[in-house]
């Protein structure tokens, strides 16, 4: 088995699901298990300055052979999404995929009808799940790509500048860059390897916020509830109905933003709703937050102040921080071309650690991994594309940017 695939399969065997309800960093102590494994692997490879922080940020350096080039960083995250279990991942390799529906198990099928991109993967070697968990390509494919590219550079006779590597916790819950030590990392610029389809390159992302809504009802015996009971579930339903139905993830694409109710729990007495708010336009992002605030205000008048709203900005569109440094965009595009990859600049409908790091003074656009259908049982990754991503990362190091 190729080292790239071997690495990936090993990394996804670690359960590293981040936990939004936790106040610790990392949010799940199991993230340390993968971090310690990677720490040892880095040391065994001979990387320098290997350091694992108390908050599960892992850093390392590949010393350069050309001191006239700027220092480049590569970053991926170790956690997987809490949207689905990342425990006991049972991957299956499909060689020379035929481009048809993929039966995951007796109940679930990754179908061409639902996922038209599958036709583009015909002839690829791919890795899929057994339908009981996510795969973890987001972003353990990125980790495997970086580690393999670094090892290849070390074994080559090529010239490259200093290269920094970092693997972070809790990206999936919007905290991956919170405690990232930009000074320790000491790169002039960096790339997250956390994208999707072959050739996709992203330096524009959503502005993002989370919203937590708490609704206090009044539970009274249903037989004597007239003019007394206040059902918090019904208030929650009413609140959701006030938001634009056409501004939901399932009805939007491209640069269209949305409100997404991604969790709800409640009973008559008490309910909680959790939304994420997204838009590429900062103006429209602010309008969406204001709209939700006004909806809550309206219902608080109607229901005697029973609703509490907490909105927290998570990250912002990195575009304005990348535009002054377009040489790093040009470097990525040239490196893809040399790897035989047709590049496509897209506005990602998500966020990466790089979006926050760009606002901390580390310009950090996003490279592809070959992963698809993140955060669920239909997640898959193309080994064929991962290999091209490895070549792209190697080329970035080799070409570099002169000081």
What spans do the regions from the language model cover?
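N-terminal capping segment at the start of a domain
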Residues: 2-29, 128, 315, 372-376
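Short helix-loop-beta-strand segments that form the rim/entrance of peptidase-like active sites
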Residues: 151-173, 254
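Midchain, well-structured core segments that form catalytic/ion-binding scaffolds
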Residues: 118, 124-134, 170-293, 297, ...
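Active-site-adjacent substrate-binding region
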Residues: 234-251, 258-260, 306-307, 316-365
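Flexible, glycine/charged-enriched surface loops at secondary-structure junctions
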Residues: 20, 49, 159-162, 245-260, ...
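A non-catalytic alpha/beta surface segment that caps or lines the substrate-entry region
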Residues: 23-69, 73-79
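Zn-dependent metallopeptidase/amidohydrolase metal-coordination segment
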Residues: 267-269, 342-395
């Amino acid at each position: 088995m190729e080292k790239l695939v071997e690495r990936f399969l090993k990394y996804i065997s670690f359960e590293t699901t981040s936990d939004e309800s936790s106040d610790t960093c990392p949010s799940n102590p199991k993230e340390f298990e993968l971090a310690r494994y990677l720490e040892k692997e880095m040391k065994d490879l001979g990387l320098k300055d290997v350091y694992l922080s108390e908050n599960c940020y892992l850093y390392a350096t590949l010393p350069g052979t050309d001191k006239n080039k700027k220092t480049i960083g590569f970053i991926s995250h170790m956690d997987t999404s809490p949207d689905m279990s990342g425990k006991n991942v049972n991957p299956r390799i499909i060689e020379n995929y035929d481009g048809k529906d993929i039966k995951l198990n007796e109940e679930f099928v990754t179908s061409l009808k639902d996922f038209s991109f599958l036709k583009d993967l015909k002839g690829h070697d791919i890795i899929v799940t057994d339908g009981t968990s996510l795969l973890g390509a987001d972003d353990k494919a990125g980790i495997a790509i970086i580690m393999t590219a670094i090892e290849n550079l070390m074994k080559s006779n090529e010239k490259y500048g200093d290269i920094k590597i970092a693997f972070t916790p809790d990206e999936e819950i919007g905290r991956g860059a919170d405690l990232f030590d930009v000074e320790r990392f000491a790169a002039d610029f960096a790339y997250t390897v956390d994208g999707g389809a072959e050739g996709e390159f992203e330096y524009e992302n959503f502005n993002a916020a989370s919203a937590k809504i708490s609704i206090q009802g009044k539970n009274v015996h249903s037989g004597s509830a007239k003019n007394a009971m206040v059902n918090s579930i019904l208030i929650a339903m009413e609140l959701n109905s006030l938001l634009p139905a056409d501004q939901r993830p399932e009805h939007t694409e491209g640069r269209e933003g949305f409100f997404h109710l991604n969790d709800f729990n409640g009973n008559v007495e008490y309910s909680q709703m959790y939304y994420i708010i997204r838009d590429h336009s900062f103006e429209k992002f602010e309008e969406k937050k204001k709209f939700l605030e006004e909806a809550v205000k309206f219902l608080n008048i109607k229901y005697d102040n029973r609703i509490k709203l907490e909105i927290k900005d998570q990250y912002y569109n990195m575009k304005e921080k990348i535009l002054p440094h377009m040489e790093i965009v040009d470097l990525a595009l040239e490196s893809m071309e040399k790897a035989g990859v047709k590049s496509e600049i897209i506005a990602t409908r998500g966020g990466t650690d790089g979006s926050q790091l760009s606002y901390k003074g580390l310009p950090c656009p996003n490279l592809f991994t070959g992963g698809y259908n993140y955060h669920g049982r239909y997640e898959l990754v193309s080994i064929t594309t991962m290999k091209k991503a490895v070549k792209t990362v190697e080329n970035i190091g080799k070409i570099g940017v002169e000081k």
